[in-house]
């Protein structure tokens, strides 16, 4: 059974080569973070990368944040989850998500369907696969990438919890109210140890550029009270400050604690580099370690 601690790390692993990946996973383990989360976007395939990270660590939980359900059918997903979980001694946590139409239709050539119905059917397919093949029936936890209330509710009903990304402590409180007290609420939070406002916001704007055009995120940000003016032209200061916890170590820790106070069971920090480079800030990881 996976024991997920309070602090983990998230990183966009597509930016790292072999040596950098090994360095990242081993430093996370040395600093006693509970888990390392990674996405499936442009380069590395989810289970291949998960296997590599597990092979270069001993105790760290390796978590997909998230595996794209359009990349494989439910049986293949269950097989991948089972394989990495069994061969790692239970250190693999599968996060699932519907991804985004840009990454599904333009990149993969699939039709992007209604997210909630598609995810519900996919989870049912994984259950059927486990029932059909006894080797796949061992219980293994799943968390759902969830932004809106309906997907969050589905995660609370059908999985071990949810993994919100690009959210605020207010969203965390809402998600906790939906899923109940006993489910995992694994929140991603970008952090930046830069105290000068203009520099911090420049780096934050760079970090958010990929996400700002995506409808799933924009819809959720509007539910949180942001306007089109906040989200256009690279993001307003108010929006950037809400997405990236920047400033001193004390200020950043206060934001992380705000998520815990709102009901998060686990916060995975994404340590943006103070010079905007596409590599983790290991000084931040050290300063913010559990």
Residue ranges and their predicted role:
Residues 1-290:
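Active-site-adjacent structural elements that line small-molecule/cofactor binding pockets in enzymes
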């Amino acid at each position: 059974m996976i024991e997920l601690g309070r602090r983990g790390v998230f990183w966009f692993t597509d930016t790292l080569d072999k040596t950098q990946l090994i360095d990242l996973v081993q430093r996370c383990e040395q600093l006693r973070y509970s888990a390392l989360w990674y996405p499936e976007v442009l380069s590395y395939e989810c289970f291949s990368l998960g296997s590599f990270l597990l092979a270069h660590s001993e105790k760290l939980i390796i978590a997909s944040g998230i595996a794209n359900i359009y990349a494989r059918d439910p049986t293949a997903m269950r097989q991948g989850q089972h394989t990495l979980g069994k061969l790692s001694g239970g250190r693999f946590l599968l996060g699932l998500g519907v991804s985004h139409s840009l990454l599904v239709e333009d990149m993969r050539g699939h039709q992007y369907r209604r997210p909630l119905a598609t995810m519900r059917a996919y989870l049912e397919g994984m259950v059927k696969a486990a029932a059909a093949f006894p080797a796949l029936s061992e219980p293994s936890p799943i968390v759902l990438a969830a932004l809106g209330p309906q997907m969050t509710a589905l995660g609370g009903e059908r999985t071990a919890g949810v993994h919100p990304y690009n959210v605020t402590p207010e969203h965390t409180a809402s998600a906790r109210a939906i899923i109940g007290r006993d489910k995992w609420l694994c929140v991603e939070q970008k952090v930046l140890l830069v105290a000068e406002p203009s520099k911090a916001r420049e780096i934050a704007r760079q970090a958010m550029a990929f996400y700002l055009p995506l409808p799933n995120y924009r819809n959720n940000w509007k539910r949180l009270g942001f306007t089109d003016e906040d989200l256009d032209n690279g993001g307003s200061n108010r929006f950037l400050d809400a997405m990236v916890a920047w400033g001193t170590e004390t200020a950043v820790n206060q934001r992380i604690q705000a998520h815990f106070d709102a009901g998060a069971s686990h916060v995975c920090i994404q340590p943006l580099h103070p010079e905007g480079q596409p590599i983790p800030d290991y000084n931040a990881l050290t300063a913010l370690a559990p």
